[in-house]
């Protein structure tokens, strides 16, 4: 289905990184893009740059999200907002569990619950869930993050069953290491994390993820691209080992 058959899009976690890149790409495609994130200043800068409609809303604010979805019939929804905390379940606190489950899984369930029935009724729509290779593979630490992303992986497959017989498509994007500041947010030191995980590595850019999503959305109506694993060429599939070459 070409982009011209869709009119509106919702992107969560839209103020930076992959979310901002997705907003930029969708705006270039002529969509009315609603960008949702907590940081009003960054959203306003994004709106000036792209023409998107900013919404300074916490993805976990169910009342605010509900009002927005009641006002706009979204044709495309990209569930991109996510958080991670370092450490395994052995040293996790109550907040570590609650925050990651609420943002990474519960908020996605609610947004899909609020938007997918309209897509089914219109016989048109596309849900894109940003998951992770952590949904499928195991590596050290981040136990709760793994569990929440595994939930998104299962949900993405189940939504295809729920929409059986309707032209509502579902795509799960499973990135590996991407050149964003997520590692800095997890470890609490963006500069140190960039030196450890980003600088000197050949990594996909946020725009590469946005291009992959655009490819899935622009596919013919009879084609549902269900899952994409997007890793650096030099990252070992299924792990965090990424080779640095001169």
Regions inferred by a protein language model and the residue ranges of each:
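Conserved glycine-rich cofactor-binding loop
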Residues: 15-16
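Substrate-binding pocket helix/loop in short-chain dehydrogenase/reductase
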Residues: 88-89, 96-101
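Active-site loop immediately N-terminal to the catalytic Tyr-X3-Lys motif
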Residues: 90, 139-143
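Active-site helix of classical SDR
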Residues: 112, 148
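Alpha-helical segment proximal to the catalytic Tyr-Lys
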Residues: 117, 161-164
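Residue(s) in the substrate-gating loop at a strand-loop-helix junction
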Residues: 132
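C-terminal helical subdomain
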Residues: 172-173, 192-239
